[in-house]
């Protein structure tokens, strides 16, 4: 089975004016598609290397390649669902309670998550996740597409901080992009992920 580019639940222009249609189209149809193709290519090369008895010579490079591209595919697949033209506002129910318990209030959570996004050095993601060992919400910075994040973390909310996610519209003013996405975060999706993670 190969990976495939998922369809979006909304049109490319549905998140305007917060995220421009041009960004969405390039981001989904080009950048995300490249990660899908890269993950499939890495899997194919790994399979051939196993069959040919050459896995020892290529495993390190291909494992890194697979992690990067599969990370890109996974991260974007979550990110698209985390966004909605009907998004914004604040979460409710169990997710809202967990956020208040862990971070003190929604506003403090928002400040923390935004700071994590803006504090990334280079490319990466801000991630709100559920830590299964601690049984709590945590905010982490994911570097590139796959690094510097806890293995026991289930991502609930992800914000792409690669330049391709914002530069055409917001140029180098990342803070304006981060401020804008709060208007399109899909709290229903985040809440569903939280419910599934805590079962």
Swiss-Prot record:
One Pfam family here: Sod_Fe_C
Q: Which cofactor does it need?
A: Mn(2+)
Q: Does the keyword Acetylation apply?
A: no
Q: Where does Mn(2+) bind?
A: 27, 76, 160, 164
**Do you know which PROSITE patterns this protein is assigned to?**
SOD_MN (PS00088)
Which terms are listed as keywords in the entry?
Answer: Manganese, Metal-binding, Oxidoreductase
GO MF entry, a single one: metal ion binding
EC numbers listed for it are 1.15.1.1
Report which reactions are catalysed by this protein. 2 superoxide + 2 H(+) = H2O2 + O2
The top EC class is oxidoreductase
Q: Which residues cross the membrane?
A: none
* Note describing how the cofactor binds: Binds 1 Mn(2+) ion per subunit.
* Functional summary from the UniProt entry: Destroys superoxide anion radicals which are normally produced within the cells and which are toxic to biological systems.
The family database entries (PANTHER family) matched by this protein are listed as: SUPEROXIDE DISMUTASE 2, SUPEROXIDE DISMUTASE [MN], MITOCHONDRIAL
Similarity annotation: Belongs to the iron/manganese superoxide dismutase family.
**This protein is called what?**
Superoxide dismutase [Mn]
User: What organism does the record attribute this protein to?
Assistant: Corynebacterium diphtheriae (strain ATCC 700971 / NCTC 13129 / Biotype gravis)
Taxonomic lineage is:
Bacteria, Bacillati, Actinomycetota, Actinomycetes, Mycobacteriales
């Amino acid at each position: 089975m190969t990976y495939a580019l998922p369809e979006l639940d909304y049109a490319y222009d549905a998140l305007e004016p917060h995220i421009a249609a041009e960004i969405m189209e390039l981001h989904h149809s080009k950048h995300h598609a490249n990660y899908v193709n890269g993950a499939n290519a890495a899997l194919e090369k790994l399979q051939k290397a196993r069959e040919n008895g050459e896995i020892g010579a290529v495993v390190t490079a291909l494992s890194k390649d697979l992690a990067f591209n599969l990370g890109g595919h996974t991260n974007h697949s979550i990110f698209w669902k985390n966004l909605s033209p009907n998004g914004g506002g604040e979460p409710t129910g169990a997710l809202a309670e967990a956020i208040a318990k862990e971070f003190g209030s929604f506003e403090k959570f928002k400040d923390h998550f935004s700071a994590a996004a803006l504090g990334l050095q280079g490319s990466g993601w801000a991630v709100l996740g559920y830590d299964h060992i601690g049984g709590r919400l945590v905010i982490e910075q994911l570097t590139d597409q796959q690094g510097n994040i806890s293995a026991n973390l289930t991502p609930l909310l992800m914000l792409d901080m690669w330049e391709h996610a914002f530069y055409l519209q917001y140029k180098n003013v990342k803070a304006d992009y981060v401020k804008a996405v709060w208007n399109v975060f899909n709290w229903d999706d985040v809440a569903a992920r939280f419910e599934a993670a805590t079962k």
